[in-house]
């Protein structure tokens, strides 16, 4: 009987440790997959000729120009966006393969590299960041405002889970074909889903806004983190300054906390067992 109890206790420890490790391991695997996706994307881009790339950028710029003066913009998480994948003309823009990926976003502050896909259907948002149709494609330029949306709290990926940690002054990068565009956060808003005024194009401005649901797991509002275009070299300097600050990754904190919790549980069980044995000896 004692042997069975020990086996069950061991299984319990293993299950508890697995639950603690799951988010850490899951996020690590997701980050590795994202890095692989980015590498594969750049490999595909390397096969494009200069003429092909220039033509793709020109098509994207023409699309962006056609959006100037457009009316209202839909909520990125609206069910109406499910049909966006049926627009063949839109899906051909910046297309280099059949994945639907138009580029990727690198957010150093959040330690994530995420693929950016056409549209904001649920299928897209389960695997990466979605570009909101009828907003500018992320190729830079005056009078452009790209809107990129991502989920929070997915079991198998962070995506925009930590977007609330972004602060004014932080930088992020958009990689499209051979171009890298740098943006610095200049505005953070929390709005109702129907309030999309802050996503409109502003004459002469070059913006990218990152959108997710908030509060976490409640999702009644939208968190809008807007970045304005800055020179790449300037963004690199900001990154270097931030890099000098000593920060401990959240996953490491979670892992250490989990191990400490298990040790405390183990010590408590051992202490309880000793007291029980001692009491038994005294009674005898």
Model feature map: region roles:
Residues 2-248:
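Solvent-exposed, non-transmembrane regions of membrane-associated and secreted proteins
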Residues 239-284:
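C-terminal single-pass membrane-anchor helix
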């Amino acid at each position: 009987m004692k042997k069975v109890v020990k086996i069950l206790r061991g299984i319990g420890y293993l299950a508890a440790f697995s639950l603690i490790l799951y988010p850490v391991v899951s996020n690590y695997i997701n980050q590795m997959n994202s890095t692989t996706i980015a590498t594969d994307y750049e490999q595909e881009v390397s096969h494009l000729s200069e003429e092909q790339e220039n033509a793709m950028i020109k098509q994207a710029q023409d699309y962006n120009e056609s959006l100037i003066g457009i009316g209202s913009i839909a909520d990125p998480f609206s069910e109406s966006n499910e049909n966006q994948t049926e627009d063949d003309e839109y899906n051909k823009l910046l297309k280099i393969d059949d994945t639907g990926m138009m580029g990727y976003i690198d957010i150093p502050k959040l330690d994530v590299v995420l693929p950016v896909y056409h549209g904001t259907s649920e299928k897209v948002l389960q695997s990466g960041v979605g570009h909101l149709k009828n907003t500018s494609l992320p190729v830079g330029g005056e009078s452009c405002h790209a809107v990129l949306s991502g989920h929070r709290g997915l079991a198998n990926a962070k995506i925009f889970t930590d977007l609330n940690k972004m602060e004014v002054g932080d930088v992020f990068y958009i990689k499209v074909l051979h171009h890298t565009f740098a943006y610095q956060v200049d505005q953070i808003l929390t709005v109702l889903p129907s309030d999309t005024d802050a996503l409109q194009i502003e004459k002469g401005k070059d913006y990218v806004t990152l959108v997710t649901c908030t509060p976490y797991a409640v999702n009644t509002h939208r968190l809008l983190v807007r970045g304005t275009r800055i020179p790449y070299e300037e963004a690199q300097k900001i990154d270097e300054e931030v890099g000098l600050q000593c920060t401990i990754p959240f996953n490491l904190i979670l892992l250490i906390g989990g191990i400490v919790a298990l040790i405390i549980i183990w010590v408590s069980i051992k202490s309880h067992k000793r007291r029980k044995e001692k009491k038994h000896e005294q009674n005898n």
